[in-house]
Amino acid sequence: MRIGHGFDVHAFGGEGPLIIGGVRIPYEKGLLAHSDGDVALHALTDALLGAAALGDIGKLFPDTDEAYKGADSRELLREALRQIAQKGYRVGNVDVTIIAQAPKMLPHAPQMRINIAEDLGIHMDEVNVKATTTEKLGFTGRGEGIACEAVALLIKA
């Protein structure tokens, strides 16, 4: 078994769309990013890549490569999974924590779990998504952006 941890953060900017966990969330702002800015899937991808000792999302999908401009993070996650499978691992379970003052994430968590389970080819019982605030402290508390942490367990296939 191998464990990986991932973290991502993006600042709000522009009109959107706001996509978190593969879900389009109604909100007046989007996140500034080279790809679609999905902090949840970016953190999760980093956790999975880290567990497999494959580097990180920036190494695999560099923001200097125009091929990834506006990229769908679900596609990036699936490509990372293919590379992990080539190393002989499968996903055991994943846990994602979204850190945002607004918008509220909890109503969207069930669909995020469905998306992640589908993309990783695992059961929903092996996917957890939760959200928290920083009690109005720091950049997320001031509503300047969204952060996310994720952990992943890989098992030898």
UniProtKB/Swiss-Prot annotation:
Q: Give cofactor(s), names only.
A: a divalent metal cation
Q: Which Pfam families match?
A: YgbB
Q: Name one GO molecular function term.
A: metal ion binding
Q: Does the keyword Lyase apply?
A: yes
Q: Give, as one word, the top-level EC class.
A: lyase
Keyword Metal-binding in annotation: yes
Please list the residues that bind 4-CDP-2-C-methyl-D-erythritol 2-phosphate. 8-10, 34-35, 56-58, 61-65, 100-106, 132-135, 139, 142
Entry's cofactor comment: Binds 1 divalent metal cation per subunit.
Site annotation (Transition state stabilizer) points to H34, T133
Catalysed conversion reaction? 4-CDP-2-C-methyl-D-erythritol 2-phosphate = 2-C-methyl-D-erythritol 2,4-cyclic diphosphate + CMP
Q: What is its EC number?
A: 4.6.1.12
Might you name a Gene Ontology BP term for this protein?
Answer: isopentenyl diphosphate biosynthetic process, methylerythritol 4-phosphate pathway
InterPro entries (UniProt xref): MECDP_synthase, MECDP_synthase_CS, MECDP_synthase_sf
Keyword list (alphabetical) reads: Isoprene biosynthesis, Lyase, Metal-binding
The positions annotated for binding a divalent metal cation are D8, H10, H42
Q: What does the record note on quaternary structure?
A: Homotrimer.
Q: NCBIfam families, from UniProt?
A: ispF (TIGR00151)
Free-text function comment from the UniProt entry:
Involved in the biosynthesis of isopentenyl diphosphate (IPP) and dimethylallyl diphosphate (DMAPP), two major building blocks of isoprenoid compounds. Catalyzes the conversion of 4-diphosphocytidyl-2-C-methyl-D-erythritol 2-phosphate (CDP-ME2P) to 2-C-methyl-D-erythritol 2,4-cyclodiphosphate (ME-CPP) with a corresponding release of cytidine 5-monophosphate (CMP).
Protein family: Belongs to the IspF family.
Name listed for the protein in its UniProt record: 2-C-methyl-D-erythritol 2,4-cyclodiphosphate synthase
**Organism per entry:** Erwinia tasmaniensis (strain DSM 17950 / CFBP 7177 / CIP 109463 / NCPPB 4357 / Et1/99)
This protein's encoding gene: ispF
